[in-house]
């Protein structure tokens, strides 16, 4: 997968390209991240990248010309088929369905805004989609872009040790993840559920599914409203609800 990034702070993306799972993906050529800094497309000695908004008001906008030229350069490098995304609080909220959808693209260009944002006409002419990571405002689009890259990279074949890891994560099937345990067997007086040490794989599967359903019902009940549960899931959910209410 190829991802181009337009950012005034490309150094921030070393967190993605040099560390952890995504860093290994880059090292093994499963993921390529290229950055373009609008400052490199300026023509004045101060490398100005901000400009005053028409109509006045507080704050500045990103200057059109350097940003536009950076986007065009990224598009040329990507070739055909690249989807251009602007990270914005006004965008579609990123969830697991959205991540799965975006992961189907082989090429993405992520535009990271700064200041008060970018000219609306650039959104109309250069941007394919706007995406948000939540209903709050950050100082720039870099952290949302890194969040998006990390999330979609998990779906690239070979990035995770086991593809099942991505398939069993929270939200992968619309449910929250089940609890997980590792050594020691007893921690602060709390023990590992016996079923997990039983070696009975079918019982372990059912326990994990039941815990996932219970956790979703208790913490994020709205997630269950849009799901078509299987007969087994409905049965396990009823059991979990009865146990909780008893």
Curated annotation (Swiss-Prot):
- List the GO cellular component terms: cytosol
**Keywords, in A-Z order:** Cytoplasm, Methyltransferase, S-adenosyl-L-methionine, Transferase, tRNA processing
The chemistry this enzyme catalyses reads: guanosine(37) in tRNA + S-adenosyl-L-methionine = N(1)-methylguanosine(37) in tRNA + S-adenosyl-L-homocysteine + H(+)
The record ties this protein, via PANTHER family, to: TRNA (GUANINE-N(1)-)-METHYLTRANSFERASE
Q: What does this protein do?
A: Specifically methylates guanosine-37 in various tRNAs.
GO biological process terms, semicolon-separated: tRNA N1-guanine methylation
Residues recorded as binding S-adenosyl-L-methionine, renumbered to this chain, are 113, 133-138
Known EC number(s)?
2.1.1.228
**Protein localization:** Cytoplasm
Q: Into which family does the record put it?
A: Belongs to the RNA methyltransferase TrmD family.
Top-level taxon: Bacteria
For molecular function, the Gene Ontology terms on record are:
tRNA (guanine(37)-N1)-methyltransferase activity
Protein name per its UniProtKB record: tRNA (guanine-N(1)-)-methyltransferase
Instruction: Answer whether the UniProt record assigns the keyword S-adenosyl-L-methionine to this protein.
Output: yes
Cross-referenced InterPro entries, in alphabetical order?
Answer: Alpha/beta_knot_MTases, tRNA_m1G_MeTrfase_C_sf, tRNA_m1G_MeTrfase_TrmD, tRNA_m1G_MTases_N, tRNA_MeTrfase_TRMD/TRM10
Which SUPFAM superfamilies does the protein's record reference?
Answer: alpha/beta knot (SSF75217)
Q: Does the keyword Ribosomal protein apply?
A: no
Q: Tell me how this protein assembles.
A: Homodimer.
């Amino acid at each position: 997968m190829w991802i181009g990034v337009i950012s005034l702070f490309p150094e921030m993306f070393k967190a993605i390209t040099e560390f952890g799972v995504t860093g290994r993906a880059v090292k093994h050529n499963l993921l390529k991240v290229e950055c373009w800094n609008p400052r490199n497309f300026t023509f004045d000695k101060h490398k100005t990248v901000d400009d005053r908004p028409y109509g006045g008001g507080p704050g500045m906008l990103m200057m059109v010309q350097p940003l536009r030229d950076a986007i065009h350069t990224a598009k040329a490098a990507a070739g055909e088929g690249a989807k251009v995304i602007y990270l914005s609080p006004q965008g579609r909220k990123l969830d697991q369905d959205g991540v799965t959808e975006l992961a189907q693209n082989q090429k993405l260009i992520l535009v990271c805004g700064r200041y008060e944002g970018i000219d609306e006409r650039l959104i109309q002419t250069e941007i394919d989609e706007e995406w948000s990571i939540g209903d709050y405002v950050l100082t720039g689009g870099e952290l949302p872009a890194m969040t998006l890259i990390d999330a979609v990279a998990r779906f690239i074949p070979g990035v995770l040790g086991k593809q099942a890891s991505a398939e069993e994560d929270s939200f992968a099937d619309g449910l929250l993840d089940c609890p997980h345990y590792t050594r020691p067997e007893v921690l602060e007086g709390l023990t590992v559920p016996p079923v997990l040490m039983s070696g009975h794989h079918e019982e372990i599967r059912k326990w994990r599914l039941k815990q996932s359903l219970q956790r979703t019902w208790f913490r994020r009940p709205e997630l269950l409203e849009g799901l078509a549960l299987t007969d087994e899931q409905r049965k396990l959910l009823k059991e979990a609800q009865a146990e909780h209410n008893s």
